[in-house]
Amino acid sequence: MKEKPTIQRGYMQFVYKGARRERSDITGVKFIPHANGPVRILEPPLWEITEDKQPGESIEEYEDRKKLESETIATKINNLYVAGIDGIDIGASETSDQTRDPSKFCTMIKRRVYGLKEPTYVAYYLDRPNDIREAYIQSIALLMWYNCQANLEATRTSVLTYARDNKFM
């Protein structure tokens, strides 16, 4: 019987090669667990899984994953994950107090078919931070961690502008 997946909450954080916090010094991304974090992880990228049996993973899935890991998982796989971003252009601090139930910034990550594994959502970011740039940073870090591209809502593309201006593209 398949166990219910454990959802980890936390934040994404860039890893830098030195003390400078410049885009050119980013060497990777890591997930920092935190009980109130806006990022939810149901399954880390396959190349990040190091434990034996994952919470929620059936015996069949575990055996299939171990077989695949012995073949090639040490490197990042292109096009295994895909993302969708439903963006907002202003943060909570720029939103009127009279605005009822303002929408949140959302990024969803989905794993495509891999081996015997069915496609499934593996992570998401959902928040309306005071500074909208925090949503951009969390989303870009998620995209980098999962090595994936994103589809953007056509009318809310400020995350794209932010990524270009900060040389993530």
Predicted segments with their positions:
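RNase H-like, metal-dependent nuclease domains and their acidic two-metal-ion catalytic environment used
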Residues: M1-M169
